[in-house]
């Protein structure tokens, strides 16, 4: 993507129509908004964290925003360009449940080894708890990140090896109504 393009080329537009769940008009609107907010055509980690802070003013979303940024930044160059942004937005807002679960798995799999360790899950859940702050009243069996992660691993880690495969994560998530509802949070919003 060029730095100061005001419109997507026809080739770029066709490519994005094929790889997202947005139509041409929506893509052009998102593109315009992206460049209005990011005139350089790139969003860096600190800018991304500032955006999250606006949505979670009563907590500290910086760690969680960093984890999300790392999944959005598909080519790992330290910036999110429009294509990376719109592809991730497409999955999180309009994707099928399985697509969302794969995306969420990538979020939790911090070292990208194809497994989610207890520690990786704990780091993400801890970041989520810090982000929501005191806004959410949690049940007693989930009122600390450790309790929540223990509950998740007890439910999902079928072979009890201390790590979750993609299959274990997807199957377990589908059985947990709180995970399914969290993954459906943005449905229909964009």
From Swiss-Prot:
Protein name in the entry: Calcium-binding protein NCS-1
InterPro entries, alphabetized: EF-hand-dom_pair, EF_Hand_1_Ca_BS, EF_hand_dom, Recoverin
Function: Negatively regulates sporulation perhaps by controlling Ca(2+)-dependent desensitization of git3.
Record GO terms (molecular function): 1-phosphatidylinositol 4-kinase activator activity; calcium ion binding
Main location (coarse class): membrane
GO cellular component: cytoplasm; cytosol; intracellular membrane-bounded organelle; membrane; nucleus; plasma membrane; trans-Golgi network membrane
Binding residues for Ca(2+) 3: 157, 159, 161, 163, 168
Source species: Schizosaccharomyces pombe (strain 972 / ATCC 24843) (Fission yeast)
Localization: Membrane
Lineage per the UniProt record: Eukaryota, Fungi, Dikarya, Ascomycota, Taphrinomycotina
Gene name tied to this protein: ncs1
Binding site for Ca(2+) 1: 73, 75, 77, 79, 84
Lipidation (N-myristoyl glycine): 2
Note: Binds 3 calcium ions via the second, third and fourth EF-hand.
